[in-house]
Amino acid sequence: MSKNRFIDENSSELRDANRNPIFGYEDSPVLTLEESVKKLISLVPRVMDYVTTAKKKFNQHSSLLTRDESAAIYLYTISGTSFFESLNKALRTEDRNTLKPWFPFLKLFITALEKLPSVRATVWRGINFDDTLTFVDDEIHIWWSFNSCSEDVSAVKSFLGDSGTLFAIEVIDGKNIAEFSAMPDEKEVVLMPGTRIKRKCESLSIDDRFFILHLEEINSQT
């Protein structure tokens, strides 16, 4: 199965980080998309080709975002690239030397996401094995990577296959990026770095191969 933003391949991708690995990105200036990825050329194959595509195809009709902010979201959602995977892999290292080349893009991308209205909705995300034991009792998990979810469960199930864990997440601060995505039909909602998650109820098992786990986002002030 090809890489997909809605599916994780191991539980560490969700829960390893327990501190803010991007502290200081806020000090970066807001650059153009081209300038924001210059330090990534040696890290992400063909990144400038993807930028060129994003600058041609991004949503140019929004009054919410600048052209470069809109293109940054488009870049993140281009299918078949290693961009989103490389970004989240860097975030999960918690290593500032690894993350610093990403700071300019993070500044542009997060600036764009923060301009979008927050949505309260039930969204869906998957992991391709039984991960129900990760979430126990009232334990709160902090996700420092960007977590892509969908408001359409079928968009996630089509990538998950016949086994794994499907998360139904009640979010309170999700960012609906469908209007700016390269794949608008996926109805994507992004959970921002630092999102706090806990289990809401017991998981549901289907034939001991497929699990549904109900999670909820917790307000950062709770």
Model-derived regions, located:
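Conserved NAD+-utilizing ADP-ribose enzyme module
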Residues: 1-43, 179-222
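Internal glycine-rich, Lys/Arg-flanked active-site/core loops of soluble domains
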Residues: 34-180
